[in-house]
Amino acid sequence: MSNASKKVIVGMSGGVDSSVSAYLLMQQGYQVEGLFMKNWEEDDTDEYCAASDDLADAEKVCETLGIELHTINFAAEYWDNVFEYFLEEYKAGRTPNPDIMCNKEIKFKAFLEFAAEALDADYIATGHYVRRQQRDGKWEMLRGLDSNKDQSYFLYTLSHEHIAQTLFPVGELEKPEVRRIAEEQGLVTADKKDSTGICFIGERKFKDFLQQYLPAKPGPIESVEGEALGEHEGLMYHTLGQRKGLHIGGMADNSGEPWYVVDKDVERNVLIVAQGKKHPRLYSQGLIAGQLHWVSRNAPPEAFDCTVKTRYRQQDIPCRVTPLSNGDFQVQFKEPVAAVTPGQSAVFYSDDVCLGGGIIEQRITDFEVKL
């Protein structure tokens, strides 16, 4: 079956990466159509929401390329499967990553199903910076060629079956090349800046947004020794390793070193801080990860060595991963790691291959093997 007989639906975000993805697939001979997903019901007067601008840009790009653009509203699915999870995690004192859940529930579930069933697609495509390869009859996900833009961290929940049905055209390119292609082809998104912030919040102030949905619960800030240092406006506004926005100055040991968030006592509603970025309470020897997703869909039966990222854009950390009897996995770092944050994801790699990952359930400060 040649590419000309295969239909690809490209998730058009109104950004340069998806725009160039559509163009590249056309060059490869596929039948290409676009789909714009509306995932958030915003107030039309909201100065921060760019959904209407993004749709307009997607329409212009598709017009330039001469392809059809479909639109679909996944706001209900987004609220039920992504946003409510996001709120529950913050209520529990954790720091979630909704972009990972959005990829899992919307882009590679709702979108994939809609494209296959309603639009008769052979593949979907996105502008993510990842690559794929087939080995032993199964598809694997590799980091994007542009290490600065690699997005495999956000896609670890994908299975080999998802990857088999998805094309990632810009994963083989570096970002400057993507912009150059967009400019050459006269695409309106060529100079559009990359989106930042959480997918549904956009550029607005996180604190203001969260206050609309979760009541703030002020409480004390304490040092690791239990000394009262001030008051926080709500545990949900703080994350481990945070330095700015504590408003407590360089007191206590008079060293003048900044304070860092090292823990949250959710039961007492206390934010715990320590002074200096080398403070041992800021560091973890390992972690316990739950809700595991393996790209192969086969959980490793025994301990193995690999590397892990505990946040996006982090250097790979050599580690030992051990399955536990309850289905969780214990991760032991070769060296201590700062600001390991419950609610975030631990993503595992073997060289360039993304093996999978899970949610950080707890940090391990003194290492004890828990089998």
UniProtKB/Swiss-Prot annotation:
Entry's EC annotation: 2.8.1.13
Pfam families reported in the protein's UniProt record: tRNA_Me_trans, tRNA_Me_trans_C, tRNA_Me_trans_M
SUPFAM superfamilies: Adenine nucleotide alpha hydrolases-like (SSF52402)
Active-site annotation: C102, C199
Site (Interaction with tRNA): residue numbering on this chain: H128, Q344
A molecular function GO annotation: tRNA binding
Keyword Protein transport: no
CDD domains: MnmA_TRMU-like
Residues bound to ATP: G11, M12, S13, G14, G15, V16, D17, S18, M37, G127
Listed GO biological process terms: tRNA wobble position uridine thiolation
Keyword Endoplasmic reticulum listed: no
EC class: transferase
Subcellular location: Cytoplasm
GO cellular component: cytoplasm
Primary location class: cytoplasm
Region (Interaction with tRNA): 149-151, 311-312
NCBIfam families named among the record's database cross-references: PRK00143.1, trmU
Function: Catalyzes the 2-thiolation of uridine at the wobble position (U34) of tRNA, leading to the formation of s(2)U34.
Family, as annotated: Belongs to the MnmA/TRMU family.
Matches recorded under HAMAP family: tRNA_thiouridyl_MnmA
Identification of the protein by name: tRNA-specific 2-thiouridylase MnmA
Species: Idiomarina loihiensis (strain ATCC BAA-735 / DSM 15497 / L2-TR)
